[in-house]
Amino acid sequence: MENNVTTISREELEELREAFNKIDIDNSGYVSDYELQDLFKEASLPLPGYKVREIIEKIFAVTDSNKDGKINFEEFVSLIQELKSKDVSKSYRKSINKKLGITALGGTSSISTEGTQHSYSEEEKVAFVNWINKALQDDPDCKHILPMNPSDASLFKSLADGILLCKMINFSQPDTIDERAINKKKLTPFTISENLNLALNSASAIGCTVVNIGSQDLQEGKPHLVLGLLWQIIKVGLFADIEISRNEALIALLNEGEELDQLMKLSPEELLLRWVNYHLANAGWQKISNFSQDIRDSRAYYHLLNQIAPKGDDFDEIHVEIDFSGFNDKNDLRRAECMLQQADKLGCRQFVTPADVVAGNPKLNLAFVANLFNTYPALHKPDNSSYDLTLLEGESNEERTFRNWMNSLGVSPYVNHLYSDLSDALIIFQLYEMTRVPVDWTHVNKRPYPLLGGNMKKIENCNYAVELGKTKAKFSLVGIAGHDLNEGNPTLTLALIWQLMRRYTLNVLSDLGEGEKVNDEIIIKWVNQTLANANKKTSITSFKDKSISTSLPVLDLIDAIAPKAVRQEMVKREDLSYQDKLNNAKYAISVARKIGARIYALPDDLVEVKPKMVMTVFACLMGRGLNKIK
């Protein structure tokens, strides 16, 4: 046990980041030694004062690598790893169980080792059950499992046939899954497994990290994995419109003297915080800087609700009166309950209980606020038309696909904006490692960057990223320099990202094909051979072949790899209109995911025959075909 170093998952990392940010109130990127005890408490690892003092004396010598008496996030994570790996892990396990609302389970899966602690939050379970019950209450396909009981474990059982997960993915990101591909009646273990594959591969395609989750885990209803996946899916839906190109009224949140492109770089979380503060300023109330500590007394929420509640000014609008009578209640829980009763008048009593508000649960309070924003943003787009409207075009399908691909692999932090979030190349280095291009991390500048010269540090990273691409990855990067990545030059950035995605896809194929190098020619040859062997009439000459716009070569290939997966009555083969082609493409991509191909491409990519994305579709299907042979 002494030598075991605990690995920390991305989800845990996000929770540690949440805890760190709560204590790092001034956003300096550091916490001081005297704040360490609070930090452990926030990280679900409360330790007595003497223990913290011992740690400060002993471990600071090792962990505080730059000896500045402060700890940055990386140092904190290594400290947590150290603690969880040693004797303290015993008390850690006990303390995590005692933490309010935490249910702990021992490790039971073949992957998890003996003694691992998988805890899950009772509050999250209750919140997600209520959200799903409301979201899918009118769906006839879910009548057999809804409504679920928030106070028992029915959530974990209800996900077992895959239908609920598929439905929630479509609720968060409409049209991701073609309903015709979901198995709904007379389910068998095989058709259930297909549904779960469809859900996992579709979740991946909308940017959820599913690296450590298998269909078996979902079938067994492993709580920590189920809740982790559900939170990602729900968050995609909650954040979908908190984006300026999709909601121009957010321009109202520009600060004095701020440029629009600065506002566009903010994450949905940062935009939500700014939205709340915009309304609090109008109410004459003090700003908040987080969705945990600062909202625990519910008073900011009272003012927010009062600002966004319909005033009845418009012809078809009914006035909603926010009752402040509970505002001065001495009891925090009672005050929170009164506030939530006001939220209920807006149809927004979701995600949090009074206890979640008072405890400052950051995840659930964030969801509560996002739902308020989506229901009553109460923003008016400024009349001033002096903004650069080209900035408001939003991301292309290709950009979104690349971003979802990165996020599904678990890069950290999450990529919200393809260009600005890659401007320091840290995400690109992670992608290099995932594509087996070695990165010398001693050459990489880490966050937080100094105020003075910070951009220079980012450009140094970008220069190294381009150098790695040319020398180690052997990519074609003619005319690309570090400053192009730093400035977010779309064409040149996409050229690098495409080569990373292509390499990643081909690596998967090479692994299945005994290490043989794979190229376009080999994929096309395999596709045509497989189609011919199954007596199919379709074939392709290249990834630009116009026949691909019908999706028939894709559907026939799926049928050749997994007979009976395609229901032929769903496929239109003659006299195809544009809509027919689109329907075929939607069905093809969903069925491909259902048989186990992790496809990121969109139906439009097939209809419009986008060669890059078409290549990934056939490569993923080839991977599935080779896997079957093995």
Curated annotation (Swiss-Prot):
The protein's role, per its UniProt record: Actin-bundling protein. In the inner ear, it is required for stereocilia formation. Mediates liquid packing of actin filaments that is necessary for stereocilia to grow to their proper dimensions.
GO molecular function, one term: calcium ion binding
Matches recorded under SUPFAM superfamilies: Calponin-homology domain, CH-domain, EF-hand
GO biological process terms on file: actin filament bundle assembly; actin filament network formation
Keywords: Actin-binding, Calcium, Cell projection, Cytoplasm, Metal-binding, Phosphoprotein, Repeat
Region (Fimbrin core): 115-630
UniProt region (Actin-binding 2), positions on chain: 376-624
Binding site for Ca(2+) 2: D64, N66, D68, K70, E75
Any GO CC annotation of this UniProt entry: stereocilium
Protein name: Plastin-1
Region annotation (Fimbrin headpiece) ranges: 1-114
Quaternary data: Monomer.
Pfam families reported for this sequence: CH, EF-hand_7
Span of domain EF-hand: 11-46, 51-86
Post-translational modification: The N-terminus is blocked.
Subcellular location: Cytoplasm; Cell projection, Stereocilium
Region (Actin-binding 1): 108-375
Domain of life: Eukaryota
InterPro entries (UniProt xref): Actinin_actin-bd_CS, CH_dom, CH_dom_sf, EF-hand-dom_pair, EF_Hand_1_Ca_BS, EF_hand_dom, Fimbrin/Plastin
Ranges where the Calponin-homology (CH) domain occurs: 122-238, 266-377, 396-505, 517-626
Residues the entry annotates as binding Ca(2+) 1: D24, D26, S28, Y30, E35
